[in-house]
């Protein structure tokens, strides 16, 4: 489980080493909201390719070990420590065409969100993009919770697949 104090510590590991991180997933949503709205089993972080290996070195020094899963790739790795805190780490690159992640190109504005975790101001996926990345798959109760809070807070139309049937 990754609570606010854990998320702050993980983020500070990057910032203290001049590595900028961008939040996604549940913590990305909660950063936009400025509060912890639910329990998180992990923290999703995006790190630029030029800092990816450096950040891995840093988190290893803080006791995180890589876990191999069926969805890990060279640019998407999972890290866990003895306190059962999990970092879902993604590597991306800024290009003239936008943000390149796993061969896909996203608009440069995707990381234009600004939020807060504890007392740390963080960059994250903007609210509309957060809602959009929650589409097209079978969502769970956390997805429902996150999307509904984003739509309510930022006056975004609730997507059809999230409307009560």
Please provide the spans of the model-predicted regions.
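Active-site nucleotide-donor binding segment shared across nucleotidyl transfer reactions
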Residues: 11-43, 48-49, 54, 126
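Short secondary-structure junctions
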Residues: 61-71, 114, 158-160
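Anion (oxyanion) recognition and catalysis
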Residues: 15, 60, 116
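Helical scaffold of the NTase/Pol beta-like nucleotidyltransferase catalytic core
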Residues: 1-23, 148, 155-165
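Catalytic cores of NTP-dependent nucleotidyl/adenyl transfer enzymes across multiple folds
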Residues: 101-165
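Short, solvent-exposed loop/turn segments at secondary-structure junctions
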Residues: 28-29, 94-95, 129-131
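Conserved catalytic core of two-metal-ion nucleotidyltransferases
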Residues: 64-98
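Short, well-structured hydrophobic secondary-structure segments
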Residues: 54-61
């Amino acid at each position: 489980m990754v609570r606010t104090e854990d998320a702050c510590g993980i983020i500070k590991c990057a910032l203290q080493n001049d590595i900028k991180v961008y939040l996604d997933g549940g913590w990305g949503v909660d950063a936009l909201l400025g509060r912890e709205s639910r329990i998180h089993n992990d923290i999703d972080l995006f790190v630029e390719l030029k800092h990816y290996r450096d950040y891995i070195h840093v988190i290893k020094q803080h006791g995180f070990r890589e876990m191999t899963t069926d969805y890990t790739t060279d640019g998407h790795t999972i890290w866990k420590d003895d306190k059962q805190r999990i970092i879902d780490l993604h590597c991306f690159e800024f290009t003239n065409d936008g943000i390149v992640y796993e061969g896909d190109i996203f608009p440069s504005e995707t990381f234009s969100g600004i939020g807060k975790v504890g007392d740390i101001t963080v960059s994250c996926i903007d609210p509309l993009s957060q809602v959009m990345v929650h589409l097209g798959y079978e969502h769970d109760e956390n997805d429902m919770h996150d999307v509904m809070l984003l739509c309510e807070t930022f006056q975004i139309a609730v997507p059809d697949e999230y409307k009560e049937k």
